[in-house]
Design a protein with these regions (language model features):
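A structural boundary/capping signal
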Residues: 13-505
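Sec-dependent signal peptide recognition
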Residues: 1-8
Length: 505
């Protein structure tokens, strides 16, 4: 009887009631979902209500003198575009969106904060050169460098604009900076589910997932890619953020009054303290400008070409990066190496002379790679070994060990090669071999606190405490000269103290 009653009630629901029920299930604060509903039911009262609701959400944050009137003709949106923006499904490239639709999005987004930046109105790279760093529009500059088709550039800009409007619609008028931060993270990491690409993809093409168009098309991104998107959205919402670059990584930081929040873009935006990124090798974190973030995108593009052994294209990418980063030591090292691999020794030498023995900002020890190259302690093929893809299988690591050992037989003073060989032995849990290899480094160069720390740690593991204490004291002495005592060094000292209560620095 109950089943028959329910069936009767279901069959008695009118089409209008079904549409009403469907409408009340969608997010009342989502512009894109309201517009998508309107696109499906444009001739119904509830469809027109959805359009009005979408416009109301936009108008909340627009000045009264510039409200969008529902009576003004709004061209219908491409449903595929709206659905892709309001779901977790990756886009499969540019949709067939019309110029009229792009102009509509542009009108809806005209109140976003990035419209106050001079950089938003730049139309070519020549004009971009004159824009001050604090006036750069990150999205516009990146797309001018990356995308030749003007309409495609407009499409990607419109995509970011719609994302910003979605976030803004969920914020009250006069929202605090903290509220904006929370909503951007919620939207990027939970609603849209931007995440690190699957291993099957990133192993082959990891550096392509730094570029904004790829991020927008795929919903996948590595640290730089998602951080770039986060910064682009923050510019539209008037949320000041600072890009921070630990070695080989980037995240964004929110600083306001006494609040300091790190947004770790590879871990759904959670806060990790600075200490998480510091080590024996890294004593401080480098702050970057938005101009440098553009350059970092092209550093990663250069790495992609390098990975493909296309050294000429890598030089081109690094040259673009140089426009935005100047003669950044790490950038210049990578660019110089490409010239070296192309057989352009004189160009490479001129670059290397500028960065020889440089200590990267935040690092506890100078770069030895270029110094050894110029001392003929290694050749170009030996340098290449350090940058080849490293497999995780045991056979891959054993192959790497054999190649490094063969190269070090000919070039026994190549410090980076020795350090990499020790790391390979450690990957196989062969601490004895790793310790013996690092001792060779110590004989050549006893001023590297990182090597001294690892020697001390390995000595403790092998319970050769006397020799380990020598290296631990050496590491402490070298770091004390830099007024730096990392937590891992303190922990290692306490571990020695546990084995020998009489031990002290």
């Amino acid at each position: 009887m109950i089943v028959k009653t329910l069936l009767f009630l279901f069959l008695s629901i009118t089409p209008k009631e079904k549409i009403d029920t469907l409408y009340h299930k969608i997010d009342p604060y989502s512009i894109s979902k309201q517009l998508a509903f309107y696109e499906l039911y444009p001739d119904t009262d509830i469809g027109k209500k959805a359009l009005q609701r979408a416009l109301d959400l936009v108008n909340i944050h627009r000045p009264l003198s510039d409200q969008i009137d529902c009576k003004v003709k709004i061209p219908p949106f491409n449903p595929n575009l709206i659905i892709s923006l309001s779901s977790q499904l990756p886009k499969k490239g540019m949709e067939n969106i019309s110029e009229e639709e792009l102009l509509t999005i542009k009108k809806m987004a005209s109140h976003l904060h990035n419209r106050r930046l001079k950089g938003f109105y730049v139309q070519n790279l020549e004009d971009a050169k004159t824009i001050e760093t604090d006036q750069i529009d990150l999205t516009r500059f990146l797309l001018l460098e990356l995308v030749e088709d003007p309409k495609l550039r407009l499409f990607y800009e419109a995509t970011v604009d719609l994302m910003a409007l979605e976030i803004l619609a969920h914020l009250p008028k006069g929202a605090t900076l903290e509220e904006k931060l929370e909503k951007i993270s919620s939207y990027v990491f939970h609603d849209m589910e931007y995440r690190f690409p699957p291993q099957s993809i990133w192993v082959e093409e990891i550096d392509s997932y730094t570029l904004l168009p790829t991020i927008l098309d795929s919903r996948f991104g590595v640290c730089l890619g998602v951080s770039t998107l986060y910064l682009a959205l923050a510019q539209r919402l008037d949320l000041p953020l600072v890009p921070i670059t630990p070695p080989g990584h980037i995240f964004v930081r929110f600083e306001h009054k006494d609040a300091v929040i790190n947004i770790e873009t590879t871990a759904r935006g959670i806060h990790l303290p600075d200490s998480h990124y510091l080590s024996v090798q890294t004593k401080s974190l480098k702050r970057r400008t938005l101009r440098e973030v553009i350059g970092l995108n092209f550093m990663n593009q250069g790495a992609l070409y390098w990975q493909q052994n296309n050294h000429k294209k890598a030089v081109e990418a690094y040259t673009i990066a140089e426009k935005y980063m100047g003669e950044d030591p790490l950038l210049m090292r990578f660019k110089g190496l490409q010239h070296l691999f192309l057989g352009e020794q004189e160009i490479a030498k001129n670059i290397f002379e500028k960065i020889r023995n440089v200590t990267l900002e935040g690092s506890t020890y100078k770069d030895t790679q270029i110094d050894d190259l110029m001392l003929n302690n290694i050749d170009a093929d030996g340098i290449k070994l350090l940058y080849e893809k490293e497999g995780n299988q045991r056979s891959d690591i054993e192959k790497q060990i054999k190649l490094l050992e063969n190269k070090l037989t000919k070039f026994p003073k190549f410090r980076d090669g020795i350090f990499h060989l020790a790391g390979a032995w450690l990957a196989l849990n062969r601490t004895k071999e790793a310790f013996e290899v690092l001792l060779k480094y110590h004989v050549i160069d006893s001023q590297n606190p990182v090597v001294e720390y690892y020697l001390a740690a390995l000595a403790l593991d092998r319970l050769t405490l006397q020799s380990g204490k020598v290296h631990l004291k050496k590491a402490q002495e070298l770091l004390k000269q830099q007024s730096y005592t990392p937590n891992v060094l303190k922990d290692l000292y306490l571990a020695y103290k546990k084995e020998d209560p009489t031990f002290d620095f």
